[in-house]
């Protein structure tokens, strides 16, 4: 089921402008606005154009190395065909789901989302994909499930970064079930109308726009429904710095730097930092998920 969310960003806000400003893509990027059920609340200022190369070369994907340019340099080693996703745990129809079979059942739409890294840099990216809720509906969520766990591919011969104990491999992440079912939560299959590049998490990655980027796990091979909070790689490695929730919050700093502002990629060396928005600008849509919670404690 597609088009359940109104997009408040426009093609002028996308990074880079030149890769998107043609009629087909502009119309696709705006098509969901009149059909969605959710209204975006935050207004984004116009961003300076950025190059396609920056989007596909400035990445965190430690399976290929810890440098920002390592994923672009080494991700060509990754073989993404064939690809399947194991869906198990508390589901009615567990099994190995072929990626192409999943695509054939989904309506692919384009979502223009802000992307905020925990390292205090940001972009605006037009993703292609489908709502995670639709994939979970395909598998059938059992009563009593409370969380969704995700796992990245672990294939050292194709992912040279996994040869080093930077993290405990494979990379793992998790969401509460209500977060996973939220209409903003996307399973991305592409960007800018093209298939997802390897360095950006091909062929299938999670995008949760109100959370820091490391929650948006890449190259997913397993999804598990469970009644217990699942392990998450950065939370396991440094729990006092990376919480399970990791919602974008300018009022809760990382122990080693401020989260009150961010550096927009493509803004230039002397560009002014931008104030970070609560929940990355999606407060109206998602704040209700955390009503009554101490967001400094459950960071």
UniProtKB/Swiss-Prot annotation:
* InterPro entries reported for this sequence: MsrP, OxRdtase_Mopterin-bd_dom, OxRdtase_Mopterin-bd_sf, TAT_signal
Quick one: signal sequence residues? 1-44
Which Pfam families is this protein grouped with? Oxidored_molyb
This entry's comment on the bound cofactor is: Binds 1 Mo-molybdopterin (Mo-MPT) cofactor per subunit.
> Which UniProt keywords are given for this protein, alphabetically ordered?
Metal-binding, Molybdenum, Oxidoreductase, Periplasm, Signal
- Where does it live in the cell? Periplasm
Q: Tell me which residues bind Mo-molybdopterin.
A: 59, 62-63, 117, 152, 200, 205, 216-218
- What family is this? Belongs to the MsrP family.
| Entry protein name | Protein-methionine-sulfoxide reductase catalytic subunit MsrP
Q: What is the lineage of its organism?
A: Bacteria, Pseudomonadati, Pseudomonadota, Alphaproteobacteria, Rhodobacterales
Q: Which gene encodes it?
A: msrP
């Amino acid at each position: 089921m597609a088009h359940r969310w109104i997009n408040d960003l426009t093609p002028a806000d996308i990074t880079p402008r030149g890769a998107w400003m043609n009629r087909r893509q502009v119309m696709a990027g705006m098509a969901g606005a009149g059909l969605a059920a959710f209204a975006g609340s935050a207004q984004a200022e116009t961003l300076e154009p950025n190059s396609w190369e920056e989007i596909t070369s400035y990445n965190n994907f430690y399976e290929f190395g810890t440098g920002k340019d390592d994923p672009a340099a080494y991700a060509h080693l990754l073989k993404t065909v064939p690809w399947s996703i194991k869906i198990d745990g508390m589901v009615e129809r567990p099994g190995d789901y072929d990626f192409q079979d999943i695509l054939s059942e989904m309506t692919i739409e384009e979502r223009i989302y802000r992307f905020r890294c925990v390292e205090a840099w940001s972009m605006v990216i037009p993703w292609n994909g489908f709502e995670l809720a639709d994939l979970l509906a395909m598998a059938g969520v059992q009563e009593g499930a409370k969380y969704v766990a995700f796992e990245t591919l672990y294939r050292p011969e194709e992912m040279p970064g996994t040869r080093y104990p930077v993290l405990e491999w494979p990379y793992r992440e998790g969401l509460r079930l209500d977060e996973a079912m939220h209409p903003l939560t996307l399973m991305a299959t592409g960007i800018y109308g093209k298939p997802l590049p390897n360095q950006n998490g091909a062929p299938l990655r999670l995008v949760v726009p109100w959370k820091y980027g490391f929650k948006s796990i890449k190259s997913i091979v397993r999804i598990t429904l469970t009644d217990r909070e699942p392990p998450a790689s950065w939370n396991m490695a440094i729990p006092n710095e990376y919480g399970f929730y990791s919602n974008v919050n300018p009022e809760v700093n990382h122990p080693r730097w401020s989260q009150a502002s961010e550096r927009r990629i493509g803004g230039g060396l002397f560009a002014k930092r931008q104030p970070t928005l609560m929940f990355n600008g999606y407060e109206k849509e998602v704040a209700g998920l955390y009503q009554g919670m101490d967001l400094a404690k459950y960071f």
